[in-house]
Amino acid sequence: MQKLIIHGGKPLKGNINISGAKNAVLPIMAASILTDKLHITNVPKLTDVSTMKDLLRSHGACIEIIEHTDEFELIINTGNINNFTADYEIVRKMRASIWVLGPLLTKYGKAKVSLPGGCAIGARQVDLHIAVLKAMGATIEIEDGYINASSKGRLKGTHFVFDKVSVGATINAILAAVLAEGETVLFNCALEPEIVDLCNCLIKMGADIAGVGTSEITIKGKDSLNKMSYKVLSDRIEAGTYMFAAAITKGDVKICGIDYHIIENIALKLIETGIKVAPINNGVQVTYEGTLNSVDLETNPYPGFATDLQAQFMSLMTLSSGVSMITENIFENRFMHVPELCRMGADIVVRGNKAVVRGVEMLKGAEVMASDLRASVSLILAGLSTNSKTVLHRIYHLDRGFQDLEKKLSNCGADIKRV
């Protein structure tokens, strides 16, 4: 099994180009079911993207892959969808597989999707997905680990209030509503930029969507959607990760190819810690200037601080001057990186959904194990900060969400290699 070997103590200096957003491209790929052909550019080279390709092919899609140095182009032909079951063997690898449920159901009137997998960071039930589709007229039962959904005729527009903010359920509802009969109004929607990107793609395909980027989205269903080409936005989670990498290594890095407005909340949190963050053309520059203050953090739905960056921020706070409180409000099991950070000398105590982090002068290298995607990269950041050797095991998680991570870090002076 592969592992990463990191020799830390080297400040990162240089430029890092940000890849396409995983959390945007996956629902856009699922949206290809709603039309006959979709051309997607700026697609990151990730195993989750490969899993979604496998899933779409299992439904009968034909996918042409055009490979470039830093990205893929995908041409997805879905005119011959002939299988409406998303099997466990594919779905277990990635929770985003559930996003084929809405498109299959709204276009073909039936779908059978295995209950999803992905990182083991909490229950993340599918109740809201099912509730909104039932409100649109679907008949849904859960049998033998599968969601069996059907509708007599087209789904019907509805007014639906999400009782909690859910990125996944908001996406499935939008994907279903664009071909439903009549008007759908969704309340308490998630606001993530990746949802905005999906809506922009669907609008370009001919969907009628109002309220994009707000908590109230109105969709007037169409009979069909058009073929088109769309460029996926850049990955704010990847950008934030490298911003923290620059800070924890006392470096100076330009993060390129990302709109500042979607990472502004990350930048403001870093500025609180004493790190210099300056917008530049098509990106941001992060510079350590000798100070790293302890700052409290709470994860919340966007525009709050992303749960996908909580572990990385915690790594940074292990070296801060003082005590910080990190509160995880999204997932109930997202502190699995804490024992591994403590193996490296961090002083962290977890109490329920809160972690108290007391800054130490220095972390030390150790053999550590990744438990999930974001935890794995937090341990890399910790390893980069040490003056010794860190070995990270179970790095297959990384390839689900970070393209060319070792290359991007090495180009900025890091000593990191995969063996």
UniProtKB/Swiss-Prot annotation:
Superkingdom of origin: Bacteria
GO cellular component: cytoplasm
Main location (coarse class): cytoplasm
Binding site for UDP-N-acetyl-alpha-D-glucosamine: R95, K164, V165, S166, V167, D308, I330
GO biological-process terms attached to the record: cell division; cell wall organization; peptidoglycan biosynthetic process; regulation of cell shape; UDP-N-acetylgalactosamine biosynthetic process
Membership in a protein family: Belongs to the EPSP synthase family. MurA subfamily.
Record-given protein name: UDP-N-acetylglucosamine 1-carboxyvinyltransferase
Organism per entry: Rickettsia akari (strain Hartford)
